[in-house]
From Swiss-Prot:
Organism: Anopheles gambiae
Residue ranges that the Swiss-Prot or TrEMBL entry lists as coiled coil: none
Listed name of the protein: Serine protease inhibitor 2
InterPro entries, sorted: Serpin_CS, Serpin_dom, Serpin_fam, Serpin_sf, Serpin_sf_1, Serpin_sf_2
Positions bearing the site annotation: Reactive bond: 371-372
Gene name for this UniProt entry: SRPN2
Length: 409
């Protein structure tokens, strides 16, 4: 029986907020966002869950881009179906632009900043008998800051511990387990990306003990939630096109911000999601202006994990999971070259939001296998389900996204 050779993709993300008051001199990103895939992927996940969700579309996309890089071919100008499909879905038509984009973002994330912690890291955990092709190693390291570590999948307990320890280290201990020994059965390569963010609100909320009020979930029955409140000048818009209010809360450091999309009382989260696409969201964010806003938000803290194979197939990424997968630049060695496919993509994420700020984290894993085997004071009262996302505003990159159906803190 042939050994199954898996490539696993794992993602992890973490977000934490704290704050000391500081002037917000940095407004929303005004350029063209590259978020078509992000929104399509997020909407696919959201529609399958009637509960709280948090995930990192960025973490998924960077690993899929690394798989895209491996789908290149040395046979003249031929383009494999694997590469064509990935390019179409994740919008990698210009690979030089894509590489420059990731390199710029990752180098920016590595800069020391006293106002926030942002850590993005990618690692290949490769079986001893697999040799990753030098050209691919150079591409992965130079443009995506990806590192490589040799492990022995014949000892899955030790390898799982190695991977989990790496994830824990890069998320400040918030994520302790992304793989288990059983989940590594047949694996030859595991690609892991982690993203960790701990930020301070530019304008922290006053801490008030036991500020408990009703939260009206989709089922109509109110539950109690702990709220935080403040008045201040914030970027805000009530979008008629989306049928929702949009609020921006910046973090210290003039780099990142959190956006909240609150459906109007006569709309639901799903109805707003149906109206959101790259163009409509860009327009809604463009129309945001500084207003005096009375902000009421629930505090929340939760983790979320999801197998991503099915959602990704629903948005058009199918070939990497099939017997027809073509990843010739990834590796060579016994049972590797032209004989690997992606078996599993998995993400685990978490988020904490309170008066001081937020903490969020996510890890994504990909496993490859042998393929043979306004006017006046605005009121923003988030006492009903809403959507949120955290953006790196230097490039308009959506790092985290989620929805709240029942705030638990």
């Amino acid at each position: 029986m042939n050994k199954l050779n898996f490539v696993i993709l794992c993602l992890a993300a973490l977000l934490v907020f704290d704050a000391t008051a500081q002037q917000d001199v940095h407004g929303p990103f005004q350029g063209q966002r590259q978020n078509e895939f992000d929104l399509m992927f997020v909407k696919e996940i959201f529609k399958n869950h009637n509960s709280n969700v948090v995930l990192s579309p960025f973490s998924v996309k960077i690993l899929l881009t690394l798989i895209y890089e491996a789908s290149d071919t040395s046979f003249g100008n031929a383009v494999s179906n694997t590469k064509r499909e990935l390019s179409s879905v994740i919008q990698n038509d210009n690979i030089d632009h894509t590489r420059s984009y990731y390199k710029q973002l990752l180098e920016s994330a590595q800069q020391d900043n006293k106002d926030y912690d942002l850590n993005i890291a990618t690692n290949f955990f490769v079986d001893d008998f697999i040799e990753v092709i030098n050209k691919y190693q150079q591409i992965a390291n130079t443009h995506y800051h990806a590192m490589l570590e040799k492990v022995s999948y014949s000892n899955p307990t030790q390898t799982a511990a190695t991977i989990n320890n790496w994830v824990s280290e890069h998320t400040n201990g918030r994520l302790r387990e992304i793989v288990t020994p059983d989940s590594l059965e047949g694996a030859v390569i595991t690609l892991v990306n982690v993203i960790y963010f701990k930020g301070l609100w530019t304008y922290p909320f006053p801490e008030v003990a036991n500020n408990v009020k009703p939260f009206y979930g989709t089922r109509g029955k109110p539950t109690n939630a702990q709220y935080m409140e403040q008045n201040g000048q914030f970027y805000y818009d009530n979008s008629a096109d989306l049928g929702a209010q949009i609020l921006r809360l910046p973090y210290r450091g003039n780099k990142l911000a959190m956006y909240f999309i609150l459906p109007n009382p006569d709309n639901t989260v799903n109805q707003v999601l149906d109206r959101i696409n790259s163009a409509s969201l860009h327009q809604a964010l463009w129309y945001m202006e500084e207003n005096e806003v009375n902000v009421t938000l629930p505090k929340f803290k939760f983790d979320f994990s999801e197998q991503l194979n099915e959602p990704l197939q629903q948005v058009g990424i199918r070939e990497i999971f099939s017997q027809n997968a073509s990843l010739p630049l990834l590796a060579r060695g016994r049972g590797a070259r032209d004989e690997v496919r992606v078996s599993r993509i998995f993400q685990k994420a978490g988020i904490t939001i309170n008066e001081l700020g937020s903490e969020a984290y996510a890890a994504t894993e990909i496993q490859l296998v042998n393929k043979f085997g306004g006017d006046g004071v605005q009121i923003f009262n988030a006492n009903r389900p809403f959507i949120f996302f955290i953006e790196d505003e230097t490039l308009g990159t959506m790092l985290f996204a989620g929805k709240i159906e029942n705030p638990v803190f």
